């Protein structure tokens, strides 16, 4: 699609780093989506000022201002890039209007969606949750392993640049770990999971790096796991080009202490280690902010997939 008349109008709530980067992505690369409104609460924020310069309608009074906006009736999709706490209220206010909500906070009111893994299962959901940046990066790897061999336990460590972690990210650290841990099980397919986030203060800033550990049966096919992981990397790269393996998948006999969830397991186990890095596309944010880029890219891919199935006049 090329004409704006043939695209669905969307609103973005949250004028911080994630919301602004998502706006730029939609303006540059939206196939079925166009910007209808950019919503914040600080008129002096860089995001709102940038939206004005780019000709995007702006709202400076938050969700209440969006609902009162004369063009709200044309909005078909709303991206929420605020916080987990704020999203609960936003969802209640938006639900009666029948708009589709793509939640980029850890609120997890709707089902978890990782585009490369389970988007087709939730195309009709009124509210979908994009998990977390660490979840978007690592859960595809857990799913890649679990689709060829049982994963009894998965643990992920997401290391992001401190400079890329804004106030919203820092305020949601607890929600990050809980939401990501739940999604490792619900979407990744592990029997138990744990998530850890590290804010790396290094200067110059380093790009996002993630480590995924999976405990699998000792007789698991290593070649099948490697093939599945490589295929999944290719799938994620269709919407996050900077997503890549940092080195080959590693296999080691697990001789350490079993996680509490597996304390009764005595059979030999194999530890699968996957090392990733995510480089941002640099649309609005620096390339080291791959953690933010993968969230906005996944959200856009999800909304585009949903919108492709719906007529614009619906």
Curated annotation (Swiss-Prot):
Pfam families named among the record's database cross-references: AcetDehyd-dimer (PF09290), Semialdhyde_dh (PF01118)
MF GO annotations: acetaldehyde dehydrogenase (acetylating) activity; NAD binding
SMART domains registered for this protein in UniProt: Semialdhyde_dh
Active site residues of this protein: 133
EC number: 1.2.1.10
Entries under InterPro entries matching the protein: Acetaldehyde_dehydrogenase, Acetylaldehyde_DH_C, NAD(P)-bd_dom_sf, Semialdehyde_DH_NAD-bd
Top-level taxon of the source organism: Bacteria
Organism the protein comes from: Paraburkholderia xenovorans (strain LB400)
Record protein name field: Acetaldehyde dehydrogenase 1
Binding site for NAD(+): 15-18, 164-172, 291
Lineage: Bacteria, Pseudomonadati, Pseudomonadota, Betaproteobacteria, Burkholderiales
Catalytic activity reported: acetaldehyde + NAD(+) + CoA = acetyl-CoA + NADH + H(+)
Presence of the UniProt keyword Secreted in the record: no
Family of this protein: Belongs to the acetaldehyde dehydrogenase family.
Enzyme class: oxidoreductase
One GO biological process term: catabolic process
HAMAP family recorded: Ac_ald_DH_ac
Keyword set, alphabetical order: Aromatic hydrocarbons catabolism, NAD, Oxidoreductase
């Amino acid at each position: 699609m090329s004409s704006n008349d043939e695209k669905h109008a969307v609103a973005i709530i949250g004028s911080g780093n994630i919301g602004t980067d998502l706006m730029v992505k939609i303006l540059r690369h939206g196939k079925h989506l166009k910007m209808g409104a950019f919503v914040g609460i600080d008129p002096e924020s860089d995001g709102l000022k940038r939206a004005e310069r780019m000709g995007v309608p702006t709202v400076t009074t938050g969700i209440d201002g969006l609902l009162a906006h004369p063009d709200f009736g044309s909005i078909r999709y709303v991206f929420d890039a605020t916080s987990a706490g704020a999203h609960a209220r936003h969802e209640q206010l938006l639900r009666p209007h029948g708009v589709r909500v793509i939640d980029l906070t850890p609120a997890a009111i709707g089902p978890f969606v990782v585009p490369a893994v389970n988007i087709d299962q939730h195309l009709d959901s009124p509210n979908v949750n994009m998990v977390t940046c660490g979840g978007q990066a690592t859960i595809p790897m857990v799913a890649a392993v679990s689709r060829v061999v049982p994963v009894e336990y998965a643990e992920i460590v997401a290391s992001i640049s401190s400079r890329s972690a804004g106030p919203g990210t820092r305020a949601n650290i607890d929600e990050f770990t809980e939401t990501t841990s739940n999604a490792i099980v619900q979407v990744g397919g592990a029997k138990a999971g744990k998530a850890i986030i590290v804010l790396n203060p290094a200067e110059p800033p380093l790009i996002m790096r993630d480590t995924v550990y999976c405990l699998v049966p000792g007789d698991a096919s290593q070649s099948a796991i490697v093939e599945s992981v490589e295929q999944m990397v290719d799938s994620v790269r269709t919407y996050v080009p900077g997503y890549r393996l940092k080195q080959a998948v590693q296999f080691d006999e697990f001789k350490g202490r079993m996680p509490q969830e597996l304390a009764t397991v005595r059979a030999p186990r194999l530890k699968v280690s996957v090392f990733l890095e995510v480089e941002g596309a640099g649309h609005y944010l620096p390339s080291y902010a791959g953690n933010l880029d993968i969230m906005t890219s996944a959200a856009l891919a999800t909304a585009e997939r949903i919108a492709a199935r719906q007529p614009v006049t619906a």
